Amino acid sequence: QRMSRGLGDVYKRQVLGVVFISADYALYIFSDPFPVNIQLLDSFGVSLTIDKLSGFFISTNAIVTAAVIFYCWDRQKTAFFYMQVTILHGSVNASFICADFISLYVALEVISIASFLLIAYPRSDRSIWVGLRYLFVSNTAMLFYLVGAVLVYQTHHSFNFIGLQGAPSEAIALIFLGLLVKGGIFVSGLWLPLTHSESESPAVS
């Protein structure tokens, strides 16, 4: 336990370094007038787009993560906690630059896993139960999203966001249903209040 907390002191400085790199890169994005497009799987429309809008969200994520790190600075968190914060920070940044449904799906699933581990970090029966419930609701919501993404691909043979134009109404409904439930906007009263009330402040942030 003492060694884990000692490693935690090292990790929290590393996480802070990652946050500063994210903020610096966001400033670089603001200075670049042209967006950057990266094709991962061209035949499937799997790609990333880095523009000023994503730079704004990346800088916001850096500010929030930095606030969490400073809040936890003297709270004796272990290396595992800071590792999950790093994974969560990176996956949230990844979701901001996704330009297709599959890349966004992967990023959101990684966010769900990292969030579950942070919710269950106290390792009490209550926190583990709340974390598992959050993971179940999140994964169920993303199944609707994934079915909608497949319907978009069947129509346009591409997972790119542009495929929403002309996509079946069922695909649009399933995608938005999954995202709204995942984001805690739709039917949030069934699970979100208890998740926030039972989780530690850094995990909720």
Regions found by a protein language model. Give the residues of each.
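Central hydrophobic cores of alpha-helical transmembrane segments in multi-pass inner-membrane proteins
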Residues: R5, L16-Y28, I58-C72, L88-G90, ...
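Alpha-helical multi-pass transmembrane bundles of energy-transducing inner-membrane proteins
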Residues: M83-I87, S91-E170, L179-G184, S201-V204
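Hydrophobic alpha-helical transmembrane segments in multi-pass integral membrane proteins
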Residues: F34-V92
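Loop-to-helix transition at the N-terminal end of transmembrane alpha-helices
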Residues: D9-D24, L48, V204
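Single conserved hydrophobic/aromatic residue that forms the stacking wall/gate
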Residues: Q1-Y11
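Transmembrane helix-loop junctions and nearby membrane-interface residues
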Residues: A26-P33, A66-Q76, I97-D100, A120, ...
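Membrane-interface helix-boundary motifs at transmembrane edges
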Residues: D9-K12, Y71-F81, R123-W129, R133, ...
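Cytosolic, membrane-interface loops and tails of multi-pass inner-membrane proteins
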Residues: Q39-L41, S115, V187-S197
